[in-house]
Design a protein with these regions (language model features):
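Compact, glycine-rich, soluble single-domain proteins
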Residues: 1-79
Length: 79
């Protein structure tokens, strides 16, 4: 799954980011491969807001579409 597909309350682990330009942009936002992040908002046709390291960061949808993630858990008890 990709980052743009996560739902609010979902925790995911950032997967391998193959494209160099995407990896650089993600690093600028503090996202590294293997990092655990929580989605706090997924605005339809807008940004995905993530919480990690005690901070919130908004990721543009175009960038989020290019970052693969692995679901860890959901605040509603889903896996």
């Amino acid at each position: 799954m990709t980052l743009d597909e996560v739902t609010c309350g979902m925790a995911v682990r950032v997967g391998m980011i193959e494209e160099k330009e995407v990896r650089v942009q993600a690093l600028r936002l503090g996202l590294m491969e293997g990092e655990l992040v929580m989605c706090t908002a997924n605005v339809w046709a807008g940004a995905i807001v993530l919480e990690h390291g005690g901070q919130e960061v908004a990721i543009g949808r175009k960038l989020a579409e290019r970052i693969r993630v692995w679901p860890v858990w959901h605040s509603r008890g889903e896996r």
